[in-house]
From Swiss-Prot:
Organism expressing this protein natively: Mus musculus (Mouse)
Covalent link location (Glycyl lysine isopeptide (Lys-Gly) (interchain with G-Cter in ubiquitin)): 891
Membrane association type: Single-pass type I membrane protein
Reaction equation(s) it catalyzes: L-tyrosyl-[protein] + ATP = O-phospho-L-tyrosyl-[protein] + ADP + H(+)
Oligomeric and partner information: Heterotetramer upon binding of the ligand. The heterotetramer is composed of an ephrin dimer and a receptor dimer. Interacts (via PDZ-binding motif) with GRIP1 and PICK1 (via PDZ domain). Interacts with ARHGEF15; mediates ARHGEF15 phosphorylation, ubiquitination and degradation by the proteasome. Interacts with AQP1; involved in endolymph production in the inner ear. Interacts with EFNA5. Interacts with SPSB1. Interacts with SPSB4. Interacts with SH2D3C.
Protein name in the entry: Ephrin type-B receptor 2
Length: 986
């Protein structure tokens, strides 16, 4: 409590002496004062001397020998000049009554002080009345010292000084009155004044003069304003002015802004001198710039790094600027077949930092054309490819007999700040002979009671010419030690002598001159049971007998037909258990992976619908509103409530009335396709309604609709990482489809749907059929009679109708471009024929605005003319995952110095001089929706538009960040074009 009371007392200590403003001072009079006296025999004006023996006008009275004295002295009208409390300083002398011989008992040594308020000078000889009311008594004034006869003889002056105050006063002015009632005294001097708190700089703020309050205990709050180059902290700045004109109780404070330091006892905030800086607000002094940095002017908040030196985003401002490291040294490589060990020593110069790491760039130079391309994602790095902290790495899964160039980059925290590529050391190696990689997928072609025919794909990395394959198999109930091995020169084999109805485990491996590769993952297939075999024979027997009755001439044809029918019957009679097992893999393949079955291969397409799509009762479906129109009918939104499950929001495609059987079959074929897929990035089929009208396909509902329109509506609203996340989802969905041997053929942003969580899902499987052979224009016409999407389609698919997963990869590259450009039309307003011609001449789309170079490089990889050189969807997913894990890789913006060295289509901003009006210019840059806004704001000429800044663009009403950036970039180009024209004229 004692400490708290001491703190409160310190707050009340005055900060600076009060300022006194004099309203009246009798000592300054050079002539008679002329104050009113009553009665005339009382107070008398005489000349006298002050303590310094200066001549002054005084009043005296000494009627001590007469009783009942009531002598009044009234000043002239005194204007208060805004004061609320008045102070009166009186200097006077009083005769000691005891020193006066024979003085009566009525002798006094005191007098009274009064005041009277008025708005103007209205006093007369009789008004106000000479009495206490209407006069207001201030106090009775007594002398501290009085003089006697002895003092008079010795000419000793004993002057008393007393100060009294009164208030509040509110009229324009007042009078003072002095009442003597029987004393012998002299009123030597009277000074009337008021007090105010002085102008002061306290706690970094300026407080102007403030009048004191009306009472002695009053506290008048005054707001301060920060001194130049200071700003408020804590609470609003206040000081309190007390009744005596003293500042008390400081609250809050101002501090010097960043770039300024407090000097002259905190009364001035001075800009940091050249060569110093201050990053934050406060009263501390500026500090000298760290090494390799400087300031360009006074008042710096940070020091700018010198040329060639940089500061990382997280580096403190007082840390020296650093530079990029030099290249690693003494690289040692050790090749072992298709693997490689690299070791090196650290750079000679680390750039002055301790966060040195290494990146490995792998380039394959095996094409023989002198150009190297980046290695695919199949190459493995241990411990990792980027961000190595140790000077060594193990690289495996390289291609055999291939030349590689490895760049070992030295990077640190400021490498991204430098406009130059990282310093690196490179090493060239050639891999040796190696065995092939594992076979990735195997599927059943046919089966009987004692045989199974299998087929598989070639290894992803054959590493040479495949000589033959070795198939190993054994019964599931037995161990691997009981396996039997057979060889096949091709990738198809029929295994004979199996048990009826038994489940077998199969594995296959490839052989080159380098030896056998690894076995594939285990695959499970089951032979037919005797009952299944007999059933299939009975189903086909009438066909065989009927055909033989046609005669011996057709016997050979009948036998062939019977064999074919039996074979297809065997394939169709697979048990449910086999249907599940034949698609199951372990090891290399993803568990649960299935192979896509084209529903058009079914003799009865309705059978495909029954097999792959779930029939839903119409009573479970509730259509709510139409949201669009499709090729076969309307697209609606609604709800689906299945028994025992919660109600969900769904999209419903309906088949319009009056349909033909072919239209019904084509409509339901999409459900037969979708029903085979189960992946979070592929649109999910809930089921179909075929037993009532209208026929419906019911899918999950995607709240944000198609990706292209969604991006256009949200132009510039997403971060690069969010866009990469969308691309990663699309790639994951396409990887799943490719692994099922499904080719989409119409991959485009318009066929990607987006839900409320920004999850992108592949949809629209209407073009996923082979082109008809009898089409009149195979370059442009599809099996469904619609146009091939030229802008999204790979050149080999346009020219030869060769659709593969590799052609889907090309389309995916176009989707990447659509996403990064926020739904801009690929190839802009070029005609389809111009697009085909440009692609044939190896022209490719340029990077969209603000597109990271790594993403544009991936687009260019997808647009390789040779489809075998394009990445697979699995590699694309891995690449995007690495970008998401390392966002710094997305900081470098295109243009990119690519190893592919493909020419890019020029989509520069047009020269403004080719347009007659601002409206035409806005249309040309695809911003025509703002024509009216520009006109209303007065931006109707190119001279005015060229001066627009970001605040002007906002004022016009352009709120989308992408549109703001596009217009601002176009204006900057316009300025450059204007400057160029002016320089030519000069």
């Amino acid at each position: 409590m004692a400490v708290r009371r001491l703190g409160a007392a310190l707050l009340l200590l005055p900060l600076l002496a009060a300022v006194e403003e004099t309203l009246m001072d009798s000592t300054t009079a050079t002539a008679e004062l002329g104050w009113m006296v009553h009665p005339p025999s009382g107070w008398e004006e005489v000349s006298g001397y002050d303590e310094n023996m200066n001549t002054i006008r005084t009043y005296q009275v000494c009627n001590v020998f007469e009783s009942s004295q009531n002598n009044w002295l009234r000043t002239k009208f005194i204007r208060r000049r805004g004061a609320h409390r008045i102070h009166v300083e009186m200097k006077f002398s009083v005769r000691d009554c005891s020193s006066i011989p024979s003085v009566p008992g009525s002798c006094k040594e005191t007098f009274n002080l009064y005041y009277y308020e008025a708005d103007f000078d209205l006093a007369t000889k009789t008004f106000p009345n000479w009495m206490e009311n209407p006069w207001v008594k201030v106090d009775t004034i007594a002398a501290d010292e009085s003089f006697s006869q002895v003092d008079l003889g010795g000419r000793v002056m004993k002057i008393n000084t007393e100060v009294r105050s009164f208030g509040p006063v509110s009229r324009n002015g007042f009078y003072l009155a002095f009442q003597d009632y029987g004393g012998c005294m002299s009123l030597i001097a009277v000074r009337v004044f008021y007090r105010k708190c002085p102008r002061i700089i306290q706690n970094g703020a300026i407080f102007q003069e403030t009048l004191s309050g009306a009472e002695s205990t009053s506290l008048v709050a005054a707001r301060g304003s920060c001194i130049a180059n200071a700003e408020e902290v804590d609470v609003p700045i206040k000081l309190y002015c007390n009744g005596d004109g003293e500042w008390l109780v400081p609250i809050g404070r101002c501090m010097c802004k960043a770039g300024f330091e407090a000097v002259e006892n905190g009364t001035v905030c001075r800009g940091c001198p050249s060569g110093t800086f201050k990053a934050n607000q406060g009263d501390e002094a500026c500090t000298h710039c760290p090494i390799n940095s400087r300031t360009t002017s006074e008042g710096a908040t940070n020091c700018v790094c010198r040329n060639g030196y940089y500061r990382a985003d997280l580096d403190p401002l007082d840390m020296p600027c650093t530079t990029i490291p030099s290249a690693p040294q003494a690289v040692i490589s050790s090749v072992n077949e298709t693997s490689l060990m690299l070791e090196w020593t650290p750079p000679r110069d680390s750039g002055g930092r301790e966060d040195l790491v290494y990146n490995i760039i792998c380039k394959s130079c095996g094409s023989g054309r002198g150009a190297c391309t980046r290695c695919g994602d199949n190459v493995q790095y241990a411990p990792r490819q980027l961000g190595l902290t140790e000077p060594r790495i193990y690289i495996s899964d390289l291609l055999a007999h291939t030349q590689y160039t490895f760049e070992i980059q030295a990077v640190n925290g400021v490498t991204d700040q430098s406009p130059f590529s990282p310093q690196f050391a490179s090493v060239n190696i050639t891999t040796n002979q190696a065995a092939p990689s594992a076979v990735s997928i195997m599927h059943q072609v046919s089966r009987t009671v004692d045989s199974i025919t299998l087929s598989w794909s070639q290894p992803d990395q054959p590493n040479g010419v495949i000589l033959d394959y070795e198939l190993q198999y054994y019964e599931k109930e037995l161990s691997e030690y009981n396996a039997t091995a057979i060889k096949s020169p091709t990738n198809t084999v029929t295994v004979q002598g199996l048990k009826a109805g038994a489940i077998y485990v199969f594995q296959v491996r490839a052989r080159t001159v380098a030896g056998y590769g690894r076995y594939s993952g285990k695959m499970y297939f089951q032979t037919m049971t005797e009952a299944e075999y007999q059933t299939s024979i009975k189903e086909k027997l009438p066909l065989i007998v009927g055909s033989s009755a046609a005669g011996l001439v057709f016997l050979i044809a009948v036998v062939v037909i019977a064999i074919v029918c039996n074979r297809r019957g065997f394939e169709r009679a697979d048990s449910e258990y086999t249907d599940k097992l034949q698609h199951y893999t372990s090891g290399h393949m993803t568990p649960g992976m299935k192979i896509y079955i084209d529903p058009f291969t079914y003799e009865d397409p309705n059978e495909a619908v029954r097999e792959f799509a779930k029939e839903i009762d119409i009573s479970c479906v509730k259509i709510e509103q139409v949201i669009g129109a499709g090729e076969f009918g309307e697209v609606c939104s609604g709800h689906l409530k299945l028994p025992g499950k919660r109600e969900i929001f769904v999209a419903i495609k309906t088949l319009k009335s009056g349909y033909t059987e072919k239209q019904r079959r084509d409509f339901l074929s999409e459900a037969s396709i979708m029903g085979q897929f189960d992946h979070p990035n592929v649109i999910h089929l809930e089921g179909v309604v075929t037993k009532s009208t209208p026929v419906m396909i019911i899918t999950e509902f995607m709240e944000n609709g198609s990706l292209d329109s969604f991006l256009r509506q949200n132009d510039g609203q997403f971060t690069v990482i969010q866009l990469v996340g969308m691309l990663r989802g699309i790639a994951a969905g396409m990887k799943y489809l490719a692994d099922m041997n499904y080719v989409h053929r119409d991959l485009a942003a318009r066929n990607i749907l987006v839900n409320s969580n920004l999850v992108c899902k592949v949809s629209d499987f209407g073009l996923s059929r082979f082109l008809e052979d009898d089409t009149s224009d195979p370059t442009y016409t599809s099996a469904l009679g619609g146009k091939i999407p030229i802008r999204w389609t790979a050149p080999e698919a346009i020219q030869y109708r060769k659709f593969t997963s590799a052609s889907d990869v090309w389309s995916y590259g176009i989707v990447m471009w659509e996403v990064m450009s926020y739904g801009e039309r690929p190839y802009w307003d070029m005609t389809n024929q111009d697009v085909i011609n440009a692609i044939e001449q190896d022209y490719r789309l340029p990077p969209p605005m603000d597109c990271p170079s790594a993403l544009h490089q991936l687009m260019l990889d997808c647009w390789q003319k040779d489809r075998n050189h394009r990445p697979k969807f699995g590699q694309i997913v891995n690449t995007l995952d690495k970008m998401i894990r390392n966002p710094n890789s997305l900081k470098a913006m295109a243009p990119l110095s690519s190893g592919i060295n493909l020419p890019l289509l020029d989509r520069t901003i047009p020269d403004y001089t080719s347009f007659n009006t601002v409206d035409e210019w806005l249309e040309a840059i695809k911003m025509g929706q703002y024509k009216e806004s520009f006109a209303n704001a007065g931006f109707t000429s190119f001279d005015v538009v060229s001066q627009m800044m970001m605040e002007d663009i906002l004022r016009v009403g352009v709120t989308l960040a992408g549109h703001q950036k596009k217009i601002l970039n176009s204006i900057q180009v316009m300025r450059a074009q204007m400057n160029q024209i002016q320089s030519v004229e000069v």
